[in-house]
């Protein structure tokens, strides 16, 4: 289980690093408003990844709740972005997907042989 917790921590750290780097790039290239929209989505993605990790920890328990709260988080983020005039929908959506970068990083690290893994 320690290996799982280490993986979970790594994924959260990589997601946070990607969030900071992309936030700075978006702020530099576009505007603070667009960057704030991205940041809101990225924070939602971090929360989603954390909730997903907690759900994986509970695999095998008798409860059968299929991620309704995780879906609700995504829906609330998108509705908030659509309704609030200061937020932009696309940066919020792309920010939410930032956690996928950490998953791709982990997959590539596991698939591509390195000197450590050989």
Curated annotation (Swiss-Prot):
It is a multi-pass membrane protein. GO terms for biological process: proton transmembrane transport. Keywords: Cell membrane, CF(0), Hydrogen ion transport, Ion transport, Membrane, Transmembrane, Transmembrane helix, Transport. The chain crosses the membrane at residues 11-31, 73-93, 94-114. The keyword Membrane applies. Its main location: membrane. It is found in: Cell membrane. GO terms for cellular component: plasma membrane; proton-transporting ATP synthase complex. It comes from the Bacteria. It holds the Pfam family CGL160_C. PANTHER family: NF-KAPPA-B INHIBITOR-LIKE PROTEIN-RELATED, PROTEIN CONSERVED ONLY IN THE GREEN LINEAGE 160, CHLOROPLASTIC. A possible function for this protein is to guide the assembly of the membrane sector of the ATPase enzyme complex. Belongs to the bacterial AtpI family. This is ATP synthase protein I. The lineage of its organism: Bacteria, Bacillati, Cyanobacteriota, Cyanophyceae, Synechococcales. The gene is atpI.
